């Protein structure tokens, strides 16, 4: 008795990500829930921008790419069009084995 109560600090959601290099570009591949593909494009963009802001704040260089498993079991992605060929050449198993960082999502 008499001890100060521990101050509760709500932590930010943290995700495992794969920071990889493709050609001369750093990528931060973030696996997200399969329901992500059903969200409106504006919401997808907002979420991707939040991850990009968080990566920048964490000094984690690279373009954020969101990936998820679609209804056919294939990997879908949200990324710049210049990365389409590379992203079509990998799958969720590749992403899972490449996870090498954590990224806390800053919520605003």
Regions found by a protein language model. Give the residues of each.
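Short, Lys/Arg-enriched N-terminal segments with co-localized hydrophobic residues
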Residues: 1-11
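Short edge beta-strands and adjacent turn/loop segments
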Residues: 9-29
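Short acidic, glycine/proline-enriched loop segments that cap or flank alpha-helices
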Residues: 18, 38-39
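Conserved beta-strand segments of the P-loop GTPase G domain that flank and frequently precede/overlap
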Residues: 29-33, 66-67
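Non-catalytic accessory regions used for complex assembly or targeting
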Residues: 38, 50, 104-108
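Short, non-transmembrane amphipathic alpha-helical segments
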Residues: 39-60
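A generic structural motif
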Residues: 57-70
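Polar/charged, Gly/Pro-rich intrinsically disordered segments
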Residues: 68-108
